[in-house]
């Protein structure tokens, strides 16, 4: 029998999921995205060549691997087609392997305009969205007024629905945000072009996944963003608009929880965050600058500098529970090379010194992290492929992290290339 393996982030995103998905898809027949949109930025480095993917599953660089976009993903046709073209220009065959669920909500021009208008209006209170229309598209889905990929198959009906949506959103754009109106005819013309290009890619992804499962094929489910950005379980309201935790796999693909065999949580050896929101272990000193520089901490989607801080075992324990994590992949261990001492956050205290466990953004206010200091290492870990190649203090750090989070570290990433990896227990084994 095949195995269904989920790869998801356990922090605030940018944990290095793309590399690990690419690594593990050597064993997979298919890779499926199940939530988010082109706000994701998955960076792959293969033989020194960097590729950044936003919407297409990271298995696309593996020959013969089927790439599926499940119903939980919001699809911006223009962004998807740009990504396809860019890959095809590199000689990567995409269209014959990429299939999209007709149930995927569409992101159209008015969603992007609304997203950007809202962030502009919030000023200093902005959430820090990518401004790509993700949230407004999910809102339309939940309000049951959204257009979906499959609607492009019936253009007369699509035109009627689109007119209603453009009128609805222009009312807010013009009347409240004082922004220019979206042109209906221009948007319709664009959608007609999208329809011709997307029709050959449409497929009942849920049915395909179950056919693969029954045929005994290995399937990889690729998460986007991170657990602490989950709309329900994250640091609300500084979150994304989808379920980034393991529950999103079932709803976003149609493959039920009982069919998920292994859930791999991707975790940086330190912590980063892009945009606004609480971050208890954030560093503003030379160590934070070291992590940012050595880790090349700039968002693959937005280019924004990431905030950097010490490893936080508290948020990891929460993510492990919420996702029922089977094992952890610890990434960017090499970024800690050269640090004399390293701190690990083991808890939080409020102003009165009481131990607390925050559940939303407001409950983080005023909290101080409680640190455990461990010795660092001066030797390089870059490119290590076995545990024995790591410095003794690096091995001790890994062991201590395991003890604090209560989950096994099954994979360790020691560099950006797919080959710079230590695999202690293979998820597909």
Swiss-Prot record:
Q: Does the keyword Nucleotide-binding apply?
A: yes
| Assigned EC number | 6.3.4.4
MF terms in GO: adenylosuccinate synthase activity; GTP binding; magnesium ion binding
Binding sites annotated in the UniProt record for IMP? 14-17, 39-42, 130, 144, 225, 240, 304
InterPro entries per record: Adenylosuccin_syn_GTP-bd, Adenylosuccin_syn_Lys_AS, Adenylosuccinate_synth_dom1, Adenylosuccinate_synth_dom2, Adenylosuccinate_synth_dom3, Adenylosuccinate_synthetase, P-loop_NTPase
Q: Which residues bind Mg(2+)?
A: 14, 41
* Residues the record marks as active site: 14, 42
Question: GO BP, one example?
Answer: IMP metabolic process
GO CC terms in record: cytoplasm
Cofactor(s) needed for function: Mg(2+)
Reaction equation(s) it catalyzes: IMP + L-aspartate + GTP = N(6)-(1,2-dicarboxyethyl)-AMP + GDP + phosphate + 2 H(+)
**Keywords per UniProt:** Cytoplasm, GTP-binding, Ligase, Magnesium, Metal-binding, Nucleotide-binding, Purine biosynthesis
Report the co-factor binding details. Binds 1 Mg(2+) ion per subunit.
Q: Which residues bind substrate?
A: 300-306
Against SMART domains, the record matches this protein to: Adenylsucc_synt
Q: In which pathway does it act?
A: Purine metabolism; AMP biosynthesis via de novo pathway; AMP from IMP: step 1/2
Give the binding site residues for GTP: 13-19, 41-43, 306, 332-334, 413-415
* NCBIfam families (alphabetical): PRK01117.1, purA
Question: Which family is it part of?
Answer: Belongs to the adenylosuccinate synthetase family.
Q: What is the stated purpose of this protein?
A: Plays an important role in the de novo pathway of purine nucleotide biosynthesis. Catalyzes the first committed step in the biosynthesis of AMP from IMP.
**Quaternary structure?**
Homodimer.
| UniProt protein name | Adenylosuccinate synthetase
Q: Tell me which species this is from.
A: Pseudomonas fluorescens (strain Pf0-1)
Organism placement in taxonomy: Bacteria, Pseudomonadati, Pseudomonadota, Gammaproteobacteria, Pseudomonadales
The gene designation is purA
């Amino acid at each position: 029998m095949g195995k269904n393996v989920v790869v998801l982030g356990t922090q605030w995103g940018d944990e290095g999921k793309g590399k690990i998905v690419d690594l593990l898809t050597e064993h997979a027949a298919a890779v499926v995205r199940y939530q988010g949109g082109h706000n994701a930025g998955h960076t792959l480095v293969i033989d020194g060549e960097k590729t950044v993917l936003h919407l297409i599953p990271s298995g696309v660089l593996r020959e013969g691997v089927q790439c599926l976009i499940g119903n939980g993903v919001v699809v911006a046709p223009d962004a998807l087609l740009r990504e396809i073209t860019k890959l095809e220009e590199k000689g990567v065959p995409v269209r014959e392997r990429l299939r999209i669920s007709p149930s995927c909500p569409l992101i159209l021009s008015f969603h992007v305009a609304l997203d950007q208008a809202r962030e502009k209006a919030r000023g200093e209170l902005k959430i820090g969205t990518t401004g790509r229309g993700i949230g407004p598209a999910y809102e339309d889905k939940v309000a049951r007024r959204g257009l979906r990929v499959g609607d492009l198959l019936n253009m007369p009906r699509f035109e009627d629905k689109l007119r209603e949506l453009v009128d609805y959103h222009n009312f807010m754009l013009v009347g409240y945000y004082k922004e220019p109106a979206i042109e209906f005819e221009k948007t319709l013309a664009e959608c007609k072009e999208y329809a011709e290009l997307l029709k050959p890619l449409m497929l009942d992804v849920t049915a395909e996944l179950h056919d693969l499962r029954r045929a005994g094929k290995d399937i990889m489910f690729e998460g986007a963003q991170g657990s602490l950005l989950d709309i329900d379980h994250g640091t609300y309201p500084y979150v994304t608009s989808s379920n980034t935790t393991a529950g999103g796999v079932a709803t976003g693909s149609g493959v039920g929880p009982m069919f998920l065999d292994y859930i791999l949580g991707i975790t940086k050896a330190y912590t980063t965050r892009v945009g606004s929101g609480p971050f208890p272990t954030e560093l503003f000193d030379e160590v934070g600058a070291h992590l940012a520089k050595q880790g090349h901490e700039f968002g693959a989607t937005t280019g924004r500098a990431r905030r950097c801080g010490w490893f936080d075992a508290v948020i990891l324990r929460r993510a492990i529970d919420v996702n029922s994590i089977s094992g952890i992949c610890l990434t960017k261990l090499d970024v800690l090379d050269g640090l004399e001492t390293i701190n690990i956050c083991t808890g939080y205290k409020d102003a009165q010194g009481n131990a607390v466990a925050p559940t939303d953004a407001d409950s983080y206010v005023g909290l101080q992290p409680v640190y455990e200091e461990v010795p660092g290492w001066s030797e390089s870990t870059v490119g290590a492929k076995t545990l024995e190649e790591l410095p003794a203090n690096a091995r001790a750090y890994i062991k201590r992290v395991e003890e604090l989070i209560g989950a096994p570290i099954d994979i360790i990433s020691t560099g950006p290339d797919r080959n710079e990896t230590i695999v202690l227990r293979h998820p597909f084994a």
